[in-house]
């Protein structure tokens, strides 16, 4: 995203050699537009019908509010082909197993269960209060949600102003058990519920394992949009039960209650909107990299998935360390 607001690009190529590339293209400024507007400008109406499925139903918001730069960062050529071709991979033991295995190989393993309550940056050092004890470091890389960073760190006015521009998606999940003989045999997109007017209803349900009739079915719901009121969480949970019934997959009941075996509401896909994207939000944050012994990474600096987040972290380390 860095430089896009000014029609400039500068970084490492997505090749094995990762050679440095830079240049100018005024058309890059269009990436700050909401994706709906970008498609209209380029006369690409059919793209929305294909891309709304892996974007909006996966919790990344509506095309009339999310800047194009985020959409194209996520749905690059390879990723789009994999979705269209049904080549979607999952990990047998879940994605957390990747990081557990990685952590086991690190010379300095991650310290878990760390409750950070205070960060003070002074005298070219970083003082962090973690689990009630103060520790001192040379540099700080923040990957936690930046909009909450001022709640425990000695943020400057510039940091507070920029981070206050961040919003996020309220993306909810419910794992439910379906009535016997009513189980779906595959996952399913509910296209009409990917439109803003149907906010708070099931956009997709996920059927993970083949030929396991009693597996939990996972429902996914968005509960907020730009400029709108945040919907009530419990009401959206009730909506999903009605939706599954209407889709022919009624939730099984036990002792008169629906069998919802797990549910959650998540801080998901932090982002800025088009007006701040176009005003150079990313360039302003980039200009702060290294100041006060602090660097900024995490989802907001790239995109809300593992691939892009890791890519930015790699790029940050190459540039500054």
Model feature map: region roles:
Residues 67, 91, 95, 306-309:
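Conserved donor sugar-nucleotide recognition element shared by glycan-biosynthetic enzymes
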Residues 137-139, 147-295, 302-307, 311:
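C-terminal segments that line or cap access tunnels to active or ligand-binding sites in enzymes
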Residues 36, 40, 99, 103, ...:
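Non-transmembrane alpha-helical segments in soluble domains
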Residues 74-130, 135, 139:
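Helical element adjacent to the flavin cofactor pocket in flavoenzyme catalytic cores
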Residues 1-66:
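Mobile amphipathic helical/loop "lid" adjacent to a hydrophobic cofactor/ligand pocket
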Residues 309-321:
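Internal hydrophobic alpha-helix adjacent to the cofactor/substrate pocket in enzyme cavities
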Residues 29-30, 93, 231-234:
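Soluble non-cytosolic domains of exported or imported proteins
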Residues 46, 118, 147-148:
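Glycine-rich nucleotide phosphate-binding loop and flanking beta-alpha elements
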């Amino acid at each position: 995203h860095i430089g896009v607001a000014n029609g400039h690009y500068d970084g490492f190529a997505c090749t094995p050699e990762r050679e440095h590339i830079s240049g100018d293209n005024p058309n890059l400024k269009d990436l700050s537009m909401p994706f709906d507007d970008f498609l209209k400008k380029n006369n690409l109406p059919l793209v929305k019908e294909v891309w709304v499925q892996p974007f909006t139903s996966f919790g990344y918001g509506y095309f009339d509010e999310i800047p194009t730069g985020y959409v194209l960062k996520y749905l690059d050529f390879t990723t789009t082909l994999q979705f269209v071709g049904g080549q979607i991979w999952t990990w047998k033991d879940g994605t957390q197993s990747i990081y557990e295995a990685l952590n086991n190989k690190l010379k300095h393993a991650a310290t878990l269960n760390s409750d950070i309550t205070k960060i003070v940056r002074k005298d070219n050092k970083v003082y962090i209060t973690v689990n009630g004890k103060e520790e001192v470091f040379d540099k700080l890389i923040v990957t936690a949600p930046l909009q909450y960073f001022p709640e425990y760190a000695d943020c400057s006015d510039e940091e507070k102003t920029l981070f206050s521009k961040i919003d996020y998606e309220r993306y909810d999940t419910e794992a439910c058990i379906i009535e016997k003989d009513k189980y779906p045999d595959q996952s399913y997109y509910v296209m009409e519920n990917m439109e803003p007017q149907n906010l708070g209803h099931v956009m997709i349900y996920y059927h993970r394992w083949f030929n396991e009739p009693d597996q939990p079915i996972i429902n996914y719901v968005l509960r907020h949009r730009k400029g709108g009121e945040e919907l009530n969480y419990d009401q959206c949970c009730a909506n999903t039960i009605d939706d599954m019934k209407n889709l022919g997959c009624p939730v099984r009941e036990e002792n008169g209650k629906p069998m919802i075996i797990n549910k959650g509401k998540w801080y998901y896909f932090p982002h800025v909107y088009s007006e701040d994207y176009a005003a150079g939000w990313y360039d302003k944050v980039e200009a702060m990299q290294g100041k006060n012994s602090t660097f900024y990474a995490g989802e907001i600096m790239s995109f809300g998935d593992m691939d892009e987040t890791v890519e930015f972290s790699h790029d940050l380390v190459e540039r500054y360390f």
